[in-house]
Amino acid sequence: MKLTCMMIVAVLFLTAWTVVTAVPHSNKRLANLYLKARHEMKNPEASNVDKRCFESWVACESPKRCCSHVCLFVCA
């Protein structure tokens, strides 16, 4: 019984701590995501969803943009 009560108190404390230490303006992040999504709906060229991966021997900046996921200044 004591262990159950201690667990309940611990969960309530951790929940309250999470709420108190949360970023105060996190709702602005959601608003920015909404505006970005709306802009992408109006301007489909701005969307990252339709962008395809790069083929071999194309200049790249990150491995996830290459079809092979290997980037050494060019897609391998």
Swiss-Prot record:
The entry's propeptide annotation covers 23-50
Q: What protein name does the entry list?
A: Conotoxin PnMKLT1-1111
Gene Ontology CC: extracellular region
The organism named in the record is Conus pennaceus (Feathered cone)
Q: Which residues form the signal peptide?
A: 1-22
Domain notes, please? Answer: The presence of a 'disulfide through disulfide knot' structurally defines this protein as a knottin.
Task: List the subcellular locations.
Answer: Secreted
Tissue distribution is: Expressed by the venom duct.
Predominant place of localization: secreted
